[in-house]
Amino acid sequence: MLLDYFSQLPYPIIFCVPEPIFVMVTVVIPARMASSRFPGKPLVPIIGLPMVEHVRRRALMAAGVDQVAVATCDAAIMQAVLAYGGNAVMTKPSHERCTDRVQEAMLQLPGEIVAMVNGDEPLLVPDAITQVITPLLEHHELDVVNLLSPLETEADYFNANIVKAVCDQYGSVIYLTRAPIPFFRYRTSVPVYRQTGIMAFRNSFLSRFSMLAETPLEKTESIDMLRVLEHSIRICGVVANYPTLGVDQPSDIALIENVLGRDPLQRDLLKQTLVSAL
């Protein structure tokens, strides 16, 4: 009936089909040499390749990613990345928070969605990046997504170097802390998560974030995402499909290499990493 009506009109009708919206996704890897617990960490060799280069090559494997860049304030890191054919941008040395370094890097890079992957995540599973960017692509009201990983040992629960996360029943992060939370007054099945260094943001949000003053809890705990929570901005927590293990101190390198040798998925990713095109 409707088509008959249009066919009788004295002038042609042109139906405009909107073009699909392309959203560029950029991965930024913040890395610096001046780690208090592990100086020079990004360039420490793992199976013959600098740690940051493991992370960069794995990030390039993630579905939905358009480009990857390392953000650093150290010429040695920049030269190493460029020598392997990667992209790197220089940032100010004054940044104390990874997120602020990523925001400055994005002033030099295109992209509507920004995934941040810390340079000390050599066991990065590319799917983890896809996990954090997907909610931003599907839910326009979200600005921040953080990948969480279940805590596996009691030692990790009490380790102040591991940031714990608690979420509400809808998956939003309630709080992040170095303290052991939740406190188990009674034995329950409540999961305990650790924050990972894998997050995603809208680039427009990063600009706003950089203009927000550091907050009391952020300074107290030295956790940059507390600035987001203290300004009542929602952080969507996504539980990792695969366990993550970052490098915090020199002794962690042996653990990383052990996992690379015995875990089937990690062995396969290592092969791809070592032979990946630059």
Label for each model-derived stretch:
Residues V65, G111, H140-L142, I233:
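Short, high-confidence coil segments that cap the C-terminus of an alpha-helix
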Residues L9, P20:
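Cationic, low-complexity basic patches in intrinsically disordered or flexible, solvent-exposed regions
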Residues M24-T72:
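N-terminal glycine-rich phosphate-binding loop and ensuing alpha1 helix
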Residues A69, A75-T134:
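Short phosphate-binding loop-to-helix
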Residues D4-Y5, Y11:
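Intrinsic-disorder-associated, low-complexity terminal segments enriched in Asp/Asn/His/Tyr and depleted
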Residues V190-L278:
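Conserved alpha/beta core of the MobA/IspD/sugar-nucleotide pyrophosphorylase nucleotidyltransferase superfamily
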Residues V125-T215:
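Conserved core of the sugar-phosphate nucleotidyltransferase
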